[in-house]
């Protein structure tokens, strides 16, 4: 029981410490929400819509599998 209480207090303390010492230069949360709202209003500005994929026959990355339509086999999109 004591160990459980100590663990709860420790977690609460560490959480409070993290929020108290977090670097919030330039009001990061406000900028984050502002950018997300702008991207919802203008989907073309969204970074998520920029797809950097390779066409068939182009060199590709085996780890990222960055081919548009097929698979990356021996560093070439199929």
UniProtKB/Swiss-Prot annotation:
Subcellular location: Secreted
Superkingdom in the source lineage: Eukaryota
GO CC, any one term: extracellular region
GO MF annotation: an example: toxin activity
InterPro entries associated with the record: Conotoxin, Conotoxin_d-typ_CS
Pfam families attached to this UniProt entry: Conotoxin (PF02950)
Propeptide stretches in the record: 23-49
Keyword tags: Cleavage on pair of basic residues, Disulfide bond, Ion channel impairing toxin, Knottin, Neurotoxin, Secreted, Signal, Toxin, Voltage-gated sodium channel impairing toxin
Expressed in which tissues: Expressed by the venom duct.
Position of the signal peptide: 1-22
Disulfide-linked positions: 53-68, 60-72, 67-77
Membership in a protein family: Belongs to the conotoxin O1 superfamily.
Domain comment in the entry: The presence of a 'disulfide through disulfide knot' structurally defines this protein as a knottin.
Function: Delta-conotoxins bind to site 6 of voltage-gated sodium channels (Nav) and inhibit the inactivation process.
Protein name (Swiss-Prot/TrEMBL): Delta-conotoxin-like TxMKLT1-0111
Record lineage: Eukaryota, Metazoa, Spiralia, Lophotrochozoa, Mollusca
């Amino acid at each position: 029981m004591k160990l459980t209480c100590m663990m709860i207090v420790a977690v609460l303390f560490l959480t409070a410490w993290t929020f108290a010492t977090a670097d919030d230069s330039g009001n990061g949360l406000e900028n984050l929400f502002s950018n997300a709202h702008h991207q919802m209003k203008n989907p073309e500005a969204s970074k998520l819509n920029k797809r950097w994929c390779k066409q068939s026959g182009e060199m590709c990355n085996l780890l990222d599998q960055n081919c548009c339509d097929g698979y990356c086999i021996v560093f070439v999109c199929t």
